[in-house]
Amino acid sequence: MACGATLKRTLDFDPLLSPASPKRRRCAPLSAPTSAAATPSSAAAATAASFSAAAASPQKYLRMEPSPFGDVSSRLTTEQILYNIKQEYKRMQKRRHLETSFQQTDPCCTSDAQPHAFLLSGPASPGTPSGTSSPLKKEQPLFTLRQVGMICERLLKEREEKVREEYEEILNTKLAEQYDAFVKFTHDQIMRRYGEQPASYVS
């Protein structure tokens, strides 16, 4: 009983029997904040400053630059096309004797090649018979459709390989620049956070 009497609250602190309001009184604002109360605000300010610096640093290192692929030549010039055609024509002249010998042995190939040559050379004029056509019409075409297709295929393949090499070179350069910027940004963040602290074996 004695222990119970000493532990029991007095009537002044009982919310049901006290004449004052049972609601708790709000904390009154202090005129001058203490050092303990100022610690969370300073920590929050430091955290916000670190986040803002972290958000601004990538923009500083990774600036928006124009695309490097705009400088790549997108079209072949007339001189390049003419040079490539001449080179391909020289290659095909070396193989022409093989094709002629094959056409002489196989008559079906000569009959297939005649329509292609006719399409390239064009029909004869309606006023002149086929036997007495002009000297220009009697000339054989330089290339058949099959040869033109081979030339175009080779030119496209060479152009594709060149564009692929340029693309790989530019891509590797940009990846190296981004990696260097990332390493520098990470180093700056580490030095900003742990640079002022003394080095220890624990860290």
UniProtKB/Swiss-Prot annotation:
A motif (SYVS motif) lies at residues 200-203. One of its GO terms (cellular component) is cytoplasm. Residues 119-135 have a biased composition (Low complexity). This is Akirin-2. GO terms for molecular function: protein-macromolecule adaptor activity; transcription coregulator activity. A motif (Nuclear localization signal) lies at residues 22-27. Molecular adapter that acts as a bridge between a variety of multiprotein complexes, and which is involved in embryonic development, immunity, myogenesis and brain development. Plays a key role in nuclear protein degradation by promoting import of proteasomes into the nucleus: directly binds to fully assembled 20S proteasomes at one end and to nuclear import receptor IPO9 at the other end, bridging them together and mediating the import of pre-assembled proteasome complexes through the nuclear pore. The gene is AKIRIN2. One of its GO terms (biological process) is positive regulation of interleukin-6 production. It comes from the Eukaryota. Keywords: Adaptive immunity, Cytoplasm, Developmental protein, Immunity, Innate immunity, Membrane, Nucleus, Phosphoprotein, Protein transport, Repressor, Transcription, Transcription regulation, Transport, Ubl conjugation. The modification Phosphoserine is found at S18, S21, S57. InterPro entries: Akirin (IPR024132). Belongs to the akirin family. It is found in: Nucleus; Cytoplasm; Membrane.
